[in-house]
Regions:
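Short acidic/histidine-centered micro-motifs embedded in hydrophobic/aromatic stretches
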Residues: 12, 126, 168
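Residue-level signature of catalytic and energy-coupling elements of molecular machines
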Residues: 33, 62, 76, 127, ...
């Protein structure tokens, strides 16, 4: 599917039945009944997500799904417009960031651990391109909510990030 074809994307959004379940303590995302977890963290999906999420039909569908999920139970959500569009009245908002090189290295290490071949510089460039697209899209642009706490994780370990978030929620 062409990521620029707004009409085709809008039609697919109407057909999409996305649900989240928990199986053996793990979150499972189902698209029309199929577990799609294995696809969600691929480079292809990440890059396509940035392009297609600029389409108003996609943003509308995703916001509806995320708000419905949050209405059912307490949630921790991450996403580029969660604190500004999806859940603007959330009790706690944290804007996690890191330099593009640190994010690229983390992604590179993740892909290498999965046995995938990848190029660190290409990943960095893809991240910067995606950030630019997301910050400049017309619908739900990426920006820090005014009441969000900024946490720059560039020089933090995962344990330090967790400790910081727990302290904020505390």
């Amino acid at each position: 599917m062409n990521p620029e074809d707004a009409a085709a994307i809008a039609d697919k959004c109407k057909e999409a039945d996305i649900t989240i379940q928990y199986v053996d303590g793990e979150q499972v995302v189902l698209l029309n009944g199929e577990n799609v977890n294995a696809y969600l963290r691929t480079e292809e999906v990440g890059n396509m997500a940035s392009t297609t999420s600029a389409q108003p039909a996609v943003r509308t569908k995703l916001v509806e799904l995320q708000q419905a999920l949050a209405a059912k139970s307490d949630v921790i959500m991450d996403g580029r417009d969660i604190g500004t569009v999806v859940l603007p009245h959330a009790q706690v908002k944290i804007y996690l960031t890191a330099s593009s090189m640190v994010r690229a290295k983390r992604r590179y290490d993740e892909l290498i651990a999965k046995g995938e071949s990848c190029d660190l510089e290409k990943i960095r460039q893809d991240i910067e391109d995606r950030d630019y697209r997301d910050m400049h899209r017309e619908t739900s642009p990426l920006k820090q909510a005014e009441d969000a706490v900024l946490v720059d994780t560039s020089d933090m370990t995962i344990e330090q990030v967790i400790d910081r978030i727990v302290a904020l929620i505390g």
